[in-house]
Amino acid sequence: MAASIATRLAPVAIFVIVAGFFAVALRSGDPSRLPSPLIGKPAPQAAFPALDGLLAEGKTVPGFATADLAKGKVSIVNFWASWCAPCVDEHPMLAELKMSAGVDVYGVAYKDDGAASRRFLGRYGNPFTAVGADDSGRRGIDWGVYGTPETFVVNGRGEIVFKHVGPMTAESIKLKMLPAIAAAKNSSAQKS
């Protein structure tokens, strides 16, 4: 009888131990900084077509390609969507980051409807230098995007140097994004 109780409790004990390991792993580390195998490597080759019908000052807002990110200037690439509630909270931070850091900010409407993306930018403003569409999410997969928002710092050579997962806050901009941008600018200046 003692053996049958031990036999029945063994799977429960194993489950509790494994669940404990997962709980510890989930609580440790910064969830906004998932490791990316792309750090230090060239941004994946992709062309993000312009968001149909998006205008700024009467002119079509262009899409962009990876080559646009390798023209000697540090830039930011932000994957967002109109259906993403944290993207609404983060959106004003993008304009602030563009101004304070003096970088171009490229936006990717990720797995989003074009009309909904245009309404979002009409309502909250357009901080982007260019806005590309990734309707299917295939290009985002190449970039290692898990969801929205996700933001990348790309150095002047077109290499990804930092990835931020989740919405940026004033604190994350100050403690993470601005130092990553400064390091990328210094690195680009030294290689010139």
Residue spans of the language-model regions?
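A short beta-strand-turn-helix
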Residues: 46-75
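Hydrophobic beta-strand anchors of alpha/beta hydrolase catalytic cores
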Residues: 76-77, 105, 151
